[in-house]
Amino acid sequence: MRSSSGLNGMRENNSFPDNTRNPQILEVTPLNSMPYIGPVTHASMSSNRMNDSVEKVGGPAMIFLPSDSSSEFSNLISQTKTGVALTGSAAMGKIGLTIGLVDIAESEDSYYFRVALPGVSRDEKEFSCEIEPDGKIMIKGATTTGEQTVCKHNQIFKMLTQNLCPPGHFTINFQLPGPVSNEEFNGNFGSDGVLEGVVKKVYYED
């Protein structure tokens, strides 16, 4: 009973006076106000860093992205109209010269090497690979890239960007780990621009 009467009394005491039924609206200037800034998230931090670090590039540019990142890829490549973007295995190689990169391997009785020669003429009159008994290898050739215009499919194209080697002759020298039998050499210069060679080792008796 007391709880019931008390509840009724609260309802009666909470009745509003007549002058509050039509309240007067007042324009009040706040003493102090600050914009609300939500909690800092990892996504917002990374986007801010990306916006701060990305700079528009007017000339040719090359972007290396070893890992898959579609958002970073789209953001970076959109900053340049003449850029080149590399992803995956293409971005894991050496940065710099395209001609003359060499891989060397060995088995029990032979050495194996391969040399990157993109844009190099395979004409036997211009290309040669000489092997000395001490394991020294000298490659001579001529590049066909770097021209100002390209004629393909009955059309003439003028170069907008040029990053490959200029046309001309060149030499590449490198050393195998040990002496070889230069008469036992098998080589192949493929259409993919890679020269491969296998040469027998030589063992000298003490």
From Swiss-Prot:
Organism domain of life = Eukaryota
Q: Which InterPro entries match?
A: A-crystallin/Hsp20_dom (IPR002068), HSP20-like_chaperone (IPR008978), IDM2/3-like (IPR039321)
Q: Which residues form the sHSP domain?
A: 92-206
User: What keywords are assigned to this protein?
Assistant: Stress response
Q: Which Gene3D superfamilies match?
A: 2.60.40.790
Expression is induced as follows: Not regulated by heat.
Q: Name one Pfam family in it.
A: HSP20
Q: Which GO terms describe its cellular component?
A: nucleolus
Region feature Disordered, mapped onto this chain: 1-23
Recorded hits in SUPFAM superfamilies, A to Z, give: HSP20-like chaperones
Assembly behavior: Does not interact with IDM1.
Instruction: Return the similarity comment.
Output: Belongs to the small heat shock protein (HSP20) family.
Q: What is this protein called?
A: Alpha-crystallin domain-containing protein 22.3
Origin species, per record, is Arabidopsis thaliana (Mouse-ear cress)
Q: Which lineage?
A: Eukaryota, Viridiplantae, Streptophyta, Embryophyta, Tracheophyta
